[in-house]
Each structure stands twice: as structure tokens, then as C-alpha cells.
From Swiss-Prot:
Record carries keyword Phosphoprotein: no
Keyword match NADP: no
Gene name per UniProt: rps8
Organism: Mesostigma viride
Function noted in UniProt: One of the primary rRNA binding proteins, it binds directly to 16S rRNA central domain where it helps coordinate assembly of the platform of the 30S subunit.
Protein name: Small ribosomal subunit protein uS8c
């Protein structure tokens, strides 16, 4: 049993990128679905499938994106920010820009899981879950 499903998801995506795997299966939770939707909207992954055929745990199947003949991953790095032992909260004014705006920060807000750009536009702060670039 995994205690931190977000960290598990980030690790699975990172490992799949290292071996240029086309798809990766992650645990299906509402938070992971929200993060996957943000990745899809920002163009870091190709598609999301919901798989309930596995034993008792439903899974999300993420199709990863690569560019060129050398299959360079669109996701260069993923970093977990807020952890179970140390939560990181921010107001909308203090949301950091990841690599000067090249990357994204994913936040858990009262309006759901949002990217840093969406949270700034809606003027909503929240818990910073991870950085992706």
C-alpha cells in the first residue's frame, strides 16, 4: 500500500521517461486524476485512460509524449514540493514561476487541482503539490 500517491505517480512518470516507455500506469485517485488533467492540458502527456480491469485498484494509464527521432521526453523533470511531513502553502501573489515560466507548478486549491497560471488568473492560493518542467 502506498501512503503518498502523488509521490508514487511522480516517480513512476520519471522512471518511465528515463527508459522512454510509451505508457505508464498510476494509481487512480482524485488528486492523481487532477494532476493528469493538468499535464494533458499543458501538453506534457498525450492521453489519459481509466482502467478498472486491474485487480481491486483502478488505474490511470498515461501516454507519455516524446519529440524527435531520439525520443526526447517533453517532461524534463518532476519535483514533489509539498510532502506529508512538510506541507507548503502559498497565496496567489506568492505562487512561484517555475524556470521563469517555462515549467508549471500544480496546486491543490479550493477550486480543485490547478496549474500556477490558472490559480493566478482566478486569484486563488493553495498547497503546491509539484513542479514540472
Amino acid at each position: 500500500m502506498v501512503n503518498d500517491t502523488i509521490a508514487d505517480m511522480i516517480t513512476r512518470i520519471r522512471n518511465a521517461n528515463l527508459i522512454t516507455q510509451k505508457q505508464v500506469a498510476v494509481i487512480a485517485s482524485n488528486t492523481n486524476k487532477g494532476i493528469a488533467q493538468c499535464l494533458l492540458k499543458e501538453g506534457f502527456i498525450e492521453s489519459i485512460e481509466y482502467n478498472t480491469n486491474s485487480s481491486n485498484n483502478p488505474e490511470l494509464i498515461l501516454s507519455l509524449k516524446y519529440q524527435g527521432k531520439k525520443r526526447k521526453p517533453y517532461i524534463t523533470a518532476l519535483q514533489r514540493v509539498s510532502k506529508s511531513g512538510l506541507r507548503v502553502y502559498t497565496s496567489y501573489k506568492d505562487i512561484p514561476k517555475v524556470l521563469g515560466g517555462i515549467g508549471i507548478a500544480i496546486l491543490s486549491t479550493s477550486q480543485g487541482i490547478l496549474t500556477d497560471k490558472q490559480a493566478r488568473m482566478q486569484k486563488i492560493g493553495g498547497e503546491i503539490l509539484c513542479y514540472i518542467w
